[in-house]
Amino acid sequence: MTITPAEALTRCIEHREIFHDEMLHLMRMLMRGEMSPQIASALLMGLRVKKETVGEITAAAQVMREFATPVVTPNPQDLLDMCGTGGDGSHTFNISTTAMFVAAAAGVPIAKHGGRSASSSSGSADVLEALGANLTLSPEQVAECIQATGIGFMFAPAHHSAMKNVAPVRKELGVRTIFNILGPLTNPANAANQLMGVFHPDLVGIQVRVLQRLGSRHVLIVHGKDGMDEASLGSATLVGELKDGEIREYEIHPEDYGLSMVSNRGIKVANREESRELVIQALDNVEGVARDIVALNAGLAIYAGNKTDTIGQALSLAFETISNGSARAKLEEFCAYTRKFQK
């Protein structure tokens, strides 16, 4: 079923849903550059004001995946993505990027999808470059890196070239649109497992249901009640879990796992160099907030990656992986391997 952009805009104004096939059609028009900037911006704002539904987001994510340049691996059902929507305004160091080295050292194969800073002080690509990684890898080289080191990093702009057709509209609008929540749903390696941080509590229930419809295996969507798009030490964390096709929503607290509840002030950074320092401190097992929040998020990733039966077991494994030096060694191994491909 097709729908014109004008008809879709009328639906948004009347707070009525755009159906799945209609949303597929509209997204394909957007990704092919077949809408004028005026109509595209009106539609994106209409969806935002109406509030995007699970069905609309699912259809949009399917189209973005359709247009993406894929990374082909033998076992996508075992891969884990760790990323956040960003936009939480917390300006903390790159927690999930650090945690991926811990999870990988614990045996979880990582296919991380990320980019440069949009609203934070340091995006995942920014800090990985500061740590010495080469990110200009072809899809085949990313797949090789996953096979060899247990980690692959997919630089989002390199895999979503069709986004160039909506980039000027997004930039001029300067506010969040559906695309801010689509990035973490469109992993080019089709990773079936995921730890995703979200900037708003409402997105916990929404994103977990979208990934259920998209066929994910084991997913944890997290939002710190202090506003972080990570599991937080400064508050309880809301969790939406998809496992074996079933969804559960609950809260976790640092004290549940023997961690102290502490402010996140000590892990705020102004640039990628400051973020790099905290990454190294955490992986070098320097006691403090940076190490503990990395361990907490790595524990959730290890659990989402199906290495343990409980979050508690996964957190113990995360601390062990940091303290025995294997997480820091994984960082060095990954960076060295990516540099093999430098021209």
UniProtKB/Swiss-Prot annotation:
Similarity remark: Belongs to the anthranilate phosphoribosyltransferase family.
EC identifiers of the protein: 2.4.2.18
NCBIfam families: trpD (TIGR01245)
Protein name: Anthranilate phosphoribosyltransferase
Gene this protein is translated from: trpD
Annotated organism of origin: Bordetella petrii (strain ATCC BAA-461 / DSM 12804 / CCUG 43448)
Subunit structure: Homodimer.
Binding sites annotated in the UniProt record for anthranilate 1: 84
Database matches in Pfam families: Glycos_trans_3N, Glycos_transf_3
